[in-house]
Amino acid sequence: MKTTHLSGLLTTAGLVFGGGNSYAQQRPNILWLTIEDTSPYDFGCYGNRHVATPTIDSLAGAGIQYMRAHSVGTQSSPSRSCIITGCYASTFGMEWHRCRFATPETVFLPDYMRAAGYYCTNKSKTDYNTLCDNKAMWDSCGPAATYNNPARKKDQPFFAVFNSMATHMGRIRSYHTDQRRDFALEGLDPARLELPPHVPDIPEIRSDFAFHMEGSQDIDAWVGMFLDDLRRQRLDENTIVF
């Protein structure tokens, strides 16, 4: 049985897809892992020598890594709205953060996936710029939403979204620099980080960057948790992960 691996790191990483019968190949499971406020700088597979992200790096190394991918919505909810609709933010007036305009519900990806027989879940990021009921488009949406829900029928393919806040920039202001734990516990040394040229090289900024990279390492463990679950259930060879 041949397994093909692709991985694309935009704000997340990876795609695992492979064997099984021909019908299963036509309807793979889809696992969409979303993270917040990240860039290629935050991951080892894009050249950061100071952060440990072995799971994401292995996904990139085993498949296709995108080096010229760009967001068509340069902020939180506009970017998310573009991905879930497959459209430019300006197409439906979604380019302003949390500026609500009427949007045709049928443009949303979960509507198409459910019509194709997929069980669709979201845990639980639905911050889209739309007046539509962002939860109604899912079979299950909320803190307990999962592809492991007993409501999913046997052998029914799933489209499942999970979101982690571990790298959200709001986390930076949640802890004063003198309240953060020793970064050495995570293998990080703020003094040795390579800062972007446009930021001030001061201890506070170095602490912020190290704190953010600590979140990236937490994300790597989080991604690994899902991959382990897919392998345990023997779903890994017919699941797209991105």
What does each model-found stretch correspond to?
Residues K2, L6, G14, G20-F242:
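Formylglycine-dependent sulfatase
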